[in-house]
């Protein structure tokens, strides 16, 4: 979005601009304090959002779709989780999740560098060993930093890693080169990756292609192939 000067506030180290008017000899800290107070006053005047009812654990039939995947994941999240969403499909879908109390949501939209989540998840689980870490990543992003899964297995960490296997760089296809080969990636046998990265892998892996198959990894039910 393009904002005109009249629609914006600019804060510099020793001056501030409100609309077209500049105010000098104002320290940045003081200007930020004033702006924060104004923002709080404005937010207090806004109506609170209506809390939606919790989703049920009803399992949908048929092929796994974006809608069914994110609806199921919504019921899986619990208070205190740490959720990391990689760039692309994962971040776009996760942005609509309703987060319970004490959940940390880590996403990196500014630079848009794919592949950060696996390494960041290793750090998050190291810093918070008693919290559940959930990773949402695409297959293309995961291939860039998959070696950090070996670090997780070495340290006996147990994050939940959900790889959205789109067989390539889906966001790049949408931006440029929808049918170009450079947006294709090598197809991996993802359920065997933990065993390749650790001699003593204590990992449970599932391949999910239908919505009902999410019952095993998410709800502890049955119906999908465990590897």
Where are the model-predicted features located?
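Conserved thiamine diphosphate
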Residues: 1-10, 41, 45-46, 130-219
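Glycine-rich, anion-gripping cofactor-binding loops and their flanking helix/strand elements
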Residues: 1-9, 100-131, 143-147, 177-179, ...
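Glycine-rich, acidic loop regions that bind phosphate or pyrophosphate groups
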Residues: 1-50, 176, 213, 218
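General beta-strand structural signal in soluble alpha/beta enzymes
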Residues: 10-11, 83-87, 106-107, 135, ...
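Short gly/pro/ser/thr-enriched loop/turn and capping motifs at secondary-structure boundaries
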Residues: 15-19, 91-92, 112-114, 142-143, ...
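Short beta-alpha connecting loops at secondary-structure transitions
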Residues: 16-21, 104-107, 144, 171-183, ...
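Active-site diphosphate/adenylate-binding microenvironment
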Residues: 49-130
């Amino acid at each position: 979005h393009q904002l005109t000067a009249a629609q914006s506030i600019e804060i510099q180290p020793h001056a501030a601009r409100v609309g077209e008017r500049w105010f000098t000899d104002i320290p940045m800290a003081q200007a930020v304090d004033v702006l924060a107070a104004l923002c709080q006053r404005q937010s207090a005047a806004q109506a609170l959002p209506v809390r939606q009812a919790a989703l049920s654990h009803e399992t949908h039939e048929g092929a796994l779709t974006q809608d069914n995947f994110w609806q199921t994941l919504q019921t899986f999240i619990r208070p205190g989780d740490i959720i990391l969403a990689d760039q692309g499909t994962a971040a776009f879908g996760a942005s609509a999740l309703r987060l319970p109390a004490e959940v940390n949501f880590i996403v990196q939209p500014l630079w848009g560098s794919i592949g950060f989540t696996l390494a960041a998840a290793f750090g998050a689980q190291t810093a918070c060993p008693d919290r559940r870490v959930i990773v949402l990543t695409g297959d293309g992003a995961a291939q860039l930093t998959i070696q950090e899964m070996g670090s997780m297995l070495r340290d006996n960490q147990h994050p939940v890693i959900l790889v959205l296997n789109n067989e390539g760089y889906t966001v790049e296809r949408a931006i440029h080169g929808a049918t170009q080969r450079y947006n294709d990636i090598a197809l991996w046998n993802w359920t065997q990756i933990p065993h390749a990265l650790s001699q003593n892998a204590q990992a449970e892996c599932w391949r999910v292609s239908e919505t009902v198959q999410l019952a095993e990894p998410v709800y502890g039910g049955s119906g999908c192939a465990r590897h």
